[in-house]
Amino acid sequence: MAKKNQVARNERERKRVHQVNHGFDVLRNRLQPKNHTKKWSKADTLREAVKYIQQLQVLLNQDPQQPSVSSSTPDYTMNNSNNFNNYAVKEEFSMYLPQNYCPQNQMSVPHGDVSHNFNSPTSSVSSSSYSPTQMCYPPVSYSNYPHH
């Protein structure tokens, strides 16, 4: 019986590692320039994702009268290679979202149901006010890190 539990636990861990690695591959494919020959490490991928998210935040916080893309941000311009298809969730990202997720501009949640059921095999957390990341980690400031 203990052997069966260990085998099942190992299988769950293999699946989890595979899912994490797949997530990094998807993120890397979205962010890494096509002409870049060396594959980014996980740390590099996360670092570049943070930069990209920060640049998107700047774009979202801009005055609507200003141009939407600045020439001072050459790393991630809003071109077709890094376009997130008008914020639509791609099928490749669906495994990382709540099961009942739907963008606000495409569908409404029936009868005001805002419960979140996450696809994680080990997750039993349900909350409508915090993301899983916010529930697990304190807010982080990246201002102390050097920009490369």
Curated annotation (Swiss-Prot):
Q: Where is the composition biased (Low complexity)?
A: 120-132
Where are the annotated segments for Helix-loop-helix motif?
18-56
What GO MF terms are annotated?
DNA-binding transcription factor activity, RNA polymerase II-specific; protein dimerization activity; RNA polymerase II transcription regulatory region sequence-specific DNA binding; sequence-specific DNA binding
May I ask which residue range the UniProt record assigns to the signal sequence?
Answer: none
Query: Which consequence is recorded for altering L27F?
Result: In gm34; absent HSN motoneurons, PHB sensory neurons and PVQ neurons
Segments carrying the region annotation (Disordered) are 1-21, 63-83, 112-132
bHLH domain residues are: 4-56
Q: InterPro entries from the xrefs?
A: bHLH_dom, HLH_DNA-bd_sf, MASH1/Ascl1a-like
Describe the outcome of a gene knockout.
RNAi-mediated knockdown disrupts differentiation of ASE L/R sensory neurons.
Q: Which subcellular locations apply to this protein? A: Nucleus
Stretches for region Basic motif: 4-17
Question: Where along the chain is composition biased (Polar residues)?
Answer: 63-78
Name the SUPFAM superfamilies for this protein. Answer: HLH, helix-loop-helix DNA-binding domain
Task: State a GO cellular component annotated for this protein.
Answer: nucleus
Record Pfam families? HLH
Which Gene Ontology terms describe the biological processes this protein takes part in?
body morphogenesis; egg-laying behavior; locomotion; nematode larval development; neuroblast fate specification; neuron differentiation; neuron migration; positive regulation of growth rate
Per UniProt, the keywords (alphabetical) are: Developmental protein, DNA-binding, Neurogenesis, Nucleus, Transcription, Transcription regulation
The protein's matches in SMART domains, at most eight in alphabetical order, are given as:
HLH
Q: What does this protein do?
A: Probable transcription factor, involved in determining neuroblast cell fate, morphogenesis and aspects of terminal differentiation in both left/right symmetric and asymmetric neuronal lineages.
PANTHER family in the cross-refs: ACHAETE-SCUTE FAMILY BHLH TRANSCRIPTION FACTOR 1, ACHAETE-SCUTE TRANSCRIPTION FACTOR-RELATED
Q: What is this protein called?
A: Helix-loop-helix protein 14
Instruction: Name its species.
Output: Caenorhabditis elegans
